[in-house]
Amino acid sequence: MNARGRAIKVLLVDDHAVVRQGYHRLLERDPAMQVVAEAANSRDAIECDRLFRPDVAVLDIALPGVSGIETARRMVAHRADARILMFSMYQDAIYASRAFAAGARGYLSKASAPELLVQAVRTVADGRRFVSPDVAEALAASAAGASGVGASLSVREHEILRLLTSGYELGEIGERLGVSAKTVANHQSAIKHKLGATSALQLILVARQLGFN
């Protein structure tokens, strides 16, 4: 229950229906949780937030088109008291830092134990900040100056570089992110410039040295 003695209303935002269903079941095992809406993209997430006014919105970062971080920024712009928990596969400090800068109250990596999702939702609903241990460690390392040259990349550039390093073609990346292959190619060129790479192969080698895999 929240401070008012009623169930914590949760909005789930992830572009994979099966994943949302799993989170839905996990959260509603707790009688103090009620999933009031689900969304698969930024536009629907913002509309659901407006209609249902959840206590906590749980957002994935890698949404098609507009990212979860930009979605969080827009939610907070529309509703200043929005409480957002980012729930993402990305454990890097840069993602967490930019999520908090966008207005998120918590950041949980999908590598975390399932029970941490319930704990994180409760914490954010109470108005406190939550960071999963692995992400907290990455943030501490970043604060100590260990984030490296990769910090110059935008969130979208990080996503694209990870997918390139995993062997995806430009068209495949575009399909996953909801953008054209040309847009991905433009991002690739910008990434090469920032990392000092002169070819696609060199870019992959540099990325792996930076820990992308």
Please place each PLM-identified region on the residue numbering.
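Active-site residues of response regulator receiver
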Residues: 60, 88
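Helix-turn-helix DNA-binding segment
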Residues: 141, 147-182
